[in-house]
């Protein structure tokens, strides 16, 4: 069968869709947000493919995977095994790296185990073991006529007169020895100083290299290894000395290593992991700047922040008072005025035993002689000893991940880090960018034997590195933690892994793989997808990127609008056919008949600036950047150029620290000037709005409080005496107690992610039956949570407080979203727009700074148009917006562009351009300007 046949698809908002999709083609599904693209691609096609796979397994295997419900569809035929690559499955485990996720690290472990050369950490010489046969062959290759001495090192760096040693050698028939480099005849008296370390080598034989001496040499080497326990020194008369060893150890210090095998290179196994940080590369330590954020305060004035919330604080403070009194430390002096020694005593204590005598808050007498442990040591001890997850989470707020002082972030132990290939250990190789790592692998100098051994594994490593390079990730390193990757990056990594697997006959379903990718790298991503197609796979890609749509084999436009107004196939066919279809909104934007208009003039701003000076976090090259206030500012640049570091790590965290005294540690820079011109900071990132199913758009934006009030004033609620709290699923009373109002139960899978299953008592409604009996306009509170924003907007049209908040959610393109949709199921783009909606409800101050990280994620061009109207409204009120963005329609709207580059990773981190869109297109160095020309 050469097509996938779908009949009667009704999942979510789909309206009985019938469609045939060609197999072994690149199919792009597009449409406005909430039109039903994901419902068709993921919830119908992929879900059915997955369900059929699970059904084919044994009942034993199925019990671990749980039952997957059949999607609401009459018929699907022609399905292949399905693999989904979305944005929500990023691994947050600190042990996961780019190398482990792509499996390149597994191949590197194998490569180092087979051709790596171990070195002695002390003497920095290769550790090799050689048989007597190999030693003989090497020596016989010396030039003919070379004079050599075969020496056996029997004493190395030992004190003593060694009289017994010399006597035994005489008895065994040896005539000469070399002591500390001097040759002695054993017939003469040899006197050595008792307290000086000596080296003694037995002269086993003296030879001239020529034909016919092989068997004598072999015997001499054999004798030498027996005498010394495996070592031979070949001293070339008038030349160098060569040390051979039969053992896998350093010939100088006997440093030895277990046999090289892949597992010793794993930082997740005890054989290879650094014993101090257990293979994490960092340790959680209390941070002085977080514990004492305000150095202008004194100890008596509450400088130690955790002491404000800590039980037993009274005891700790009284101990601190007695301690400071003993060491004459003034507790009324600001922390910044204390000497380094005084501050260290307060933080880390002393080794002196002190008598602590006082009465606690409860009136109990305390009288003990003990050592004062210091504030930092006390907090770290409390963290280790507590059984309360609440206390642990609270204390973690004062901790930072500090690089392990033993392995310096390498995660591996010393012996593993002393195994090299071409001068680099496995950590050095993983620290190279993907591009440099590929270059290193291509230029490896190996012996014939090594090349033969590593041929297959090297090919696999190069292939996988090439795929990562081809999807625009050449700036990443293999050591990069998977938890720090954006949704787009992690998706492209998994895409590269799939290309590397070379599977055929697979149905891949992808969710916006172009997220976070600069236009320059987009074509490489498209080429990778076309390569997967050419292997004989079908790709269904949910995407809004115009280039991807234009190069698709088949384009499906779902719409016409969102929610109940969508769910239909508006147009399907080749990109040209869709562009010529007047009913298709996507077609009109693709063909240029409809577009986002570029502003006629740019805003002048208010004349004030935020200025970052000397920024050098990550790859930033000590740059100075000015952000003009009262403008729409766009920060652009290729992936990995340093945009997020500059805006999120340095600017945002520094401003937040100054305005809100936050505990975050900003990235490295000399200073940030102009913060006094701001009174509010709003950061709209793609982080989840909550980690549990309790969080949802209604609770996050506050509209749920108003909805609960509406239910509390209904006639039936008043008769029963129910107040607003009765309709909360977070407190006892109205909620279902079987699931504590979650609507789902969490099943811990231990080594797998937790699984949530619907509560069998309330059937996922969150409330008990009595609460569900209270209705407003025929709907109970649970049914309202199940409404989309758009439906709820109509439903509550007579309640202005509710309606206004829902209108903002609609304006940011979330009309299709259910009010009670749980936070973990929201995509990054959806989460960021929920946050934006919450902020838009507040009154503008004219001195606010809004920072948005790729707000167009998941948005159709038509939705981008609406979003830009909202953002422009914010700037027109006098506030400032800084947007990190690749979308050229957004960049074209900016009053001021800051373009970083020129490349990603080490080759980025510089300011390429600052100014208006009209000027950047004239700058030949800017990739952004090059692509922006077409839009302007």
Can you name each region flagged by the protein language model?
Residues 1-936:
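Conserved phosphate-binding elements of NTP-dependent enzyme cores
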């Amino acid at each position: 069968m050469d097509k996938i046949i779908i009949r009667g698809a009704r999942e979510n908002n789909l309206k009985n869709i019938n469609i045939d999709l060609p197999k072994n083609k690149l199919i792009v599904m597009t449409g406005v947000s909430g039109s039903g693209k994901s419902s068709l691609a993921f919830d119908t096609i992929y879900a059915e493919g997955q369900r059929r796979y699970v059904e084919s397994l044994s009942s034993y295997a199925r019990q671990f995977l749980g039952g997957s419900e059949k999607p609401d569809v009459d018929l699907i035929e022609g399905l292949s095994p399905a693999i989904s690559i979305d944005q929500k499955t990023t691994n947050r485990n600190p042990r996961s790296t780019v190398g482990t996720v792509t499996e390149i690290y597994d191949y590197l472990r194998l490569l180092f185990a087979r051709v790596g050369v171990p070195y002695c950490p002390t003497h920095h010489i290769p550790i090799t073991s050689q048989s007597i046969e190999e030693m003989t062959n090497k020596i016989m290759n010396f030039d003919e006529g070379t004079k050599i001495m075969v020496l056996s090192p029997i004493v190395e760096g030992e004190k003593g007169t060694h009289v017994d040693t010399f006597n035994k050698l005489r008895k065994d028939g040896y005539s000469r020895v070399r002591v500390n480099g001097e040759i002695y005849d054993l017939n003469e008296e040899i006197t050595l100083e008792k307290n000086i370390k000596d080296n003694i080598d037995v002269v086993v034989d003296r030879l001239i290299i020529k034909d016919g001496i092989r068997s004598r040499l072999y015997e001499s080497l054999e004798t030498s290894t027996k005498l010394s326990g495996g070592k031979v020194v070949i001293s070339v008369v008038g030349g160098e000395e060569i040390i051979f060893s039969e053992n896998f150890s350093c010939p100088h210090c006997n440093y030895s290593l277990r046999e090289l095998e892949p597992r010793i290179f794993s930082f997740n196994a005890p054989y290879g992991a650094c014993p101090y940080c257990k293979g994490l590369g960092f340790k959680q330590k209390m941070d002085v700047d977080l514990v004492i954020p305000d150095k202008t305060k004194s100890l008596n004035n509450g400088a130690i922040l955790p002491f404000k919330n800590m039980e037993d604080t009274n005891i700790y403070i009284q101990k601190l008072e007695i301690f400071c009194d003993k060491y004459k430390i003034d507790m009324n002096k600001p922390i910044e005025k204390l000497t380094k020694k005084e501050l260290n005593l307060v933080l880390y204590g002393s080794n002196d035993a002190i008598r602590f005598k006082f009465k606690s808050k409860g009136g109990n007498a305390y009288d003990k002689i003990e050592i004062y442990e210091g504030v930092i040591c006390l907090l770290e001890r409390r963290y280790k000893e507590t059984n309360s997850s609440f206390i642990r989470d609270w204390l973690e707020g004062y901790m930072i991940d500090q690089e392990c002082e033993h392995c310096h972030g390498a995660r591996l132990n010393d012996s593993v880090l002393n195994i090299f290939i071409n001068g680099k250990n496995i950590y050095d190789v993983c620290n190279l960018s993907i591009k440099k790592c590929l270059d290193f692998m291509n230029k490896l100098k190996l012996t014939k034997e090594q090349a033969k051994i590593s041929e297959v594994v090297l090919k696999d490593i190069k292939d996988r590195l090439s795929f990562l390079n081809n999807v625009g990730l050449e700036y990443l390193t293999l050591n990069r933690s998977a938890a720090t990757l954006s949704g787009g990056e992690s998706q492209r990594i998994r895409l590269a892994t799939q290309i590397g697997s070379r599977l055929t006959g697979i149905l891949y379903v992808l969710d916006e793989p172009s997220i976070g990718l600069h236009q320059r790298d987009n074509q490489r991503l498209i080429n990778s997808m076309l390569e997967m197609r050419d292997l004989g796979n079908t790709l269904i890609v949910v995407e809004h990127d115009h280039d991807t749509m234009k190069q698709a084999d088949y384009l499906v436009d779902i719409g016409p609008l969102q929610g109940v107004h969508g769910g239909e196939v508006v147009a399907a066919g080749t990109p040209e056919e869709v562009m010529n279809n007047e009913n298709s909104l996507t077609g009109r934007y693709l063909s240029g008949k409809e577009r986002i208009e570029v502003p006629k003039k740019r805003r002048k701003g208010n004349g004030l600036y935020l200025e970052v000076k000397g920024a050098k976090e990550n790859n930033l090259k000590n740059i100075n950047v000015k952000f003009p206030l009262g403008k729409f500012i766009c920060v652009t640049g290729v992936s990995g150029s340093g945009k997020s570091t500059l805006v999120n790590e340095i600017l945002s965290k520094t401003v937040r620290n100054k305005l809100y005294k936050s505990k975050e540690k900003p990235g490295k820079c000399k200073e940030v000037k102009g913060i006094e011109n701001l009174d509010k900071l709003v950061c709209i990132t793609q982080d989840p709005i909550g980690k549990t199913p309790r969080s949802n758009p209604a609770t996050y934006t506050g509209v749920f409080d108003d909805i609960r009030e509406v239910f509390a004033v209904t006639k039936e609620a008043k008769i029963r005496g129910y107040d607003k709290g009765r309709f909360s699923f977070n407190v006892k009373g109205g909620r279902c107690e079987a699931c504590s109002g979650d609507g789902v139960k969490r099943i811990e899978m231990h080594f797998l992610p937790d699984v949530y299953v619907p509560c069998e008592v309330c059937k996922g409604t969150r409330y008990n039956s009595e609460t569900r009996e209270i209705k407003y306009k025929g709907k109970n509170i649970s049914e309202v949570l199940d409404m989309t924003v758009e439906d709820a907007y109509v439903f509550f049209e007579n309640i202005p407080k509710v309606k206004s908040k829902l209108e903002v959610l609609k304006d940011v393109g979330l009309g299709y979203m259910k009010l009670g949709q749980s936070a973990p199921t929201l995509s990054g783009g959806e989460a960021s727009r929920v946050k934006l909606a919450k902020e838009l409800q507040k009154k503008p101050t004219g001195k606010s700074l809004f920072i948005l990280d790729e707000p167009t994620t998941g948005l159709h061009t038509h939705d981008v148009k609406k979003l830009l109207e909202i953002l422009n409204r914010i700037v027109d009120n006098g506030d400032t917006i800084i947007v990190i963005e690749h979308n050229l329609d957004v960049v074209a709207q900016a009053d001021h562009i800051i373009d970083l580059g020129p490349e990603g990773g080490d080759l980025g981190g510089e300011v390429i351009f600052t100014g208006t869109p009209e000027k950047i297109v004239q700058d030949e160095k800017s990739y952004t300007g090059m692509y922006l020309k077409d839009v302007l």
